[in-house]
Curated annotation (Swiss-Prot):
Free-text function comment from the UniProt entry: Component of the mitochondrial ribosome (mitoribosome), a dedicated translation machinery responsible for the synthesis of mitochondrial genome-encoded proteins, including at least some of the essential transmembrane subunits of the mitochondrial respiratory chain. The mitoribosomes are attached to the mitochondrial inner membrane and translation products are cotranslationally integrated into the membrane.
Gene: NAM9
Entry annotated with the keyword rRNA-binding: yes
Name this polypeptide is given: Small ribosomal subunit protein uS4m
Additional comment: Present with 3270 molecules/cell in log phase SD medium.
Domain annotation S4 RNA-binding: ranges: 103-172
Native species: Saccharomyces cerevisiae (strain ATCC 204508 / S288c) (Baker's yeast)
InterPro entries: Ribosomal_uS4, Ribosomal_uS4_CS, S4_RNA-bd, S4_RNA-bd_sf
């Protein structure tokens, strides 16, 4: 039987445990070096034994630990001459004092970050959620051998490393606050869109490169640039002589009047709002006027044409057949030639215009810059406020009412109410200080499998046994257990 879990998280005692708990992190943070001065040798050994055993196998009774303790400590010897003649760091043999515990299945689960503590790993094993080499094992003390593969049910790993699932009442209160803040943000964005835009970019720029929000923003910028490149490709693909003439014919169809007067340059600008370059607009107007003089732009025909028919008509005007050429007068032929020449020049201008337009809109992922869009705030919508008294105890109704941009049709942290952890999943807070992967395990977090490669050993300058204590403390603890506590 394991020890009872009494005062494991006590801030007064300040013991460091094998746990990802936030109180344990605080104890680790405030923990100074173990004071071994002004103590007798036995007091030093006793203090070291207390501190190290609080971390290494605190759930094991002292009698059980002394049964498995091995005085022989494992290390490796350098067989080649690579270290000869240079400064060789001392091998910390005494950090191997508790290496025998690393072979246990419950410790291996914790070291592989499949459980948030050794006690939780023990619980997973006893409940039949762990397999070794495909066989269900229910013994936490099972000794792993080199080459053994162990696995845990993925849902259990998500529960162990995930954030706490809020209750329905807690989630509703958070959602109410989120809606108030969102409506405040929308109001500010609609009032001062440029200031809010620049403020958002500044916030992303100040974030560290490893911040998930910044990584998500950078991924958005990559997708944004990819979409712009696709739009640019399609725009350049349609930037041909026939394509430009089809656009002019389409403007004639939409804006053309019943009289025989050609469109003015202002009307042409109205029909082609994407053209901002005055030189290009003037060139297109000249081409249009020449084609209008040729008599090939007949409004009574164009007004009845479908989009596909406009493409065919533009192709015929650019490349008239022999029959059509014979029917044209010399003046019409001259006007067509002049129009085609101007259209050819316009293709170059339009291509440059498109390239420059998309180049200015492209974002720079390295510095997180994004061209301001004056219309961005128009798409933001206010969220209807919710009343907690009306939704209390009625989660399905609450799920339908929540419609925030980042949270649609579910209550905060309860996207899947059946799961025992926060959904959509996110890691528990203060996890990164404990994210230390050992050398003797090969881990796959995608499948929640790990391979026990070999027993942990000591090398020059390092030990593969993870411990918050230094060599002098382990030395006294080893001395204590070497004589069975005498």
């Amino acid at each position: 039987m394991p020890r009872k879990a009494n005062l494991l998280k006590s801030l007064a005692r300040g013991r460091v445990r094998t746990s990802f708990n936030k109180y344990n992190l605080f104890n680790l943070y405030k923990k100074g070096g173990v004071d071994l001065k002004s103590k007798s040798l036995y007091q030093q050994k006793w203090t070291a034994k207390q501190e190290t055993r609080a971390y290494h196998g605190e759930h094991l009774t002292e009698k059980r630990w002394q049964t498995v303790f091995k005085p022989k400590l494992d290390s490796v010897a350098q067989l080649d001459a690579s270290l000869r003649g240079g400064e060789i760091k001392e091998t910390p043999f005494l950090l191997q004092t508790f290496a025998v515990l690393e072979k246990r299945l419950d410790f291996a689960l914790f070291r592989a970050m499949f459980a948030s503590s050794v006690r939780q790993a023990r619980q997973f094993i006893l409940h039949g959620n762990v397999r070794v080499n495909g066989v269900k094992i229910k013994h936490p003390s099972y000794t792993l051998k080199p080459g053994d593969m162990f696995s845990v049910k993925p849902d259990k790993v998500l529960e162990a490393l995930g954030a706490k699932k809020p209750s329905f009442q807690e989630a509703l209160k958070i959602d109410k606050t989120q809606i108030v803040l969102w409506n405040k943000y929308v109001k500010e964005a609609k009032t001062e869109p440029k200031e809010v835009w620049e403020k958002k970019l500044e916030n992303f720029e100040k974030m560290s490169d490893s911040n998930p929000k910044k990584l998500q923003f950078q991924e958005f910028l990559r997708q944004y640039n990819k979409n712009l490149e696709s739009q640019q490709y399609n725009a350049l693909k349609g930037c041909t002589q026939e394509g430009i003439l089809r656009k002019l014919l389409n403007v004639e169809k939409e804006i053309g009047k019943s009289n025989n007067e050609p469109l003015s340059i202002d009307e042409l600008k109205q029909g082609l709002p994407e053209i901002q370059d005055s030189q290009l607009l003037e060139s297109l107007n000249n081409a249009y006027q020449e084609f209008f003089k040729s008599g090939e732009i007949r409004r009574e025909i164009i007004s009845k044409c479908q989009p596909d028919e406009l493409i065919s008509l533009a192709t015929e005007m650019m490349n008239p057949n022999e029959t059509t050429k014979k029917e044209l007068s010399d003046g019409a032929k001259s006007a067509l030639r002049s129009g085609k020449r101007i259209i050819a020049e316009s293709v170059k201008l339009w291509t440059k215009n498109i390239t420059d337009h998309f180049k200015t809109r492209m974002s720079d992922i390295s510095d997180g810059s994004l061209t301001f869009d004056p219309k961005w705030a128009k798409n933001l919508k206010y969220h209807d406020p919710i009343k907690l008294s009306e939704l209390e105890g009625d989660e399905p109704k609450a799920r339908k009412l929540i419609n925030l941009p980042w949270q649609k049709n579910y209550v905060y942290g309860r996207q899947d109410p059946k799961k025992p952890f926060f959904t959509p999943w996110k890691p528990r807070p203060f996890l990164s200080p404990f994210a230390i992967l050992p050398h003797h395990l090969e881990i796959s977090f995608k499948t929640c499998h790990a391979v026990y490669l070999r027993d942990p050993v000591a090398r020059p300058g390092q030990s593969e046994v993870i411990s918050p204590f230094d060599v002098p403390v382990h030395e006294r603890a080893y001395m204590y257990y070497l004589r069975n506590g005498k």
